Amino acid sequence: SQPLMICNGLPKEREFVTKVNFPAHIMCGSGHVVGKRLIEYTPFNDTQNSKVGLLVECGQHWASDTGVVALDTALHFLRACKVVDPNFINDRLSPGAKEPGTAEMWDVTHGITASTDNFQFCEPFVGMEIIEKKGTKIAQDGDKDIMTPYDNCLLMMPNHSPGAGVRKLRLCQRS
């Protein structure tokens, strides 16, 4: 899947991730089922203060680009915090991260968990595919069809691991 940043979607987080503006996809919401992530605890998931926690998926651990994305994201984060000289940051950003376009913000609306051991995607989705039409079949879970709930539905982090109870996918709508 392409690199992405995840936040809970609180206004303070949306404001801050807009300043970070890297990587190119910002996903707001959970869809997570196995325990709480650090960003879901107080003080981060709390409207009464300005503290923000973000989670970044930079890529596969073994992929050479993953380290580059991680460093570029950290540099953009420091730039947004205004704690490091901008020249220091610009001198260290990779060429593709120096002038990123406006990151796309998406809301996580659904989390799909396999009910059976017979869950299969209709295509070998890798993540960030946008399915144009509502009602498009994207998977089969036993005898149940899994359909997109709205037009322009983004598929976030499809999981091809087998097993009932496994989170298979998050569905997202443009913010």
Residue ranges of model-derived segments:
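Structured catalytic-domain cores with a bias toward divalent-metal coordination
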Residues: 1-175
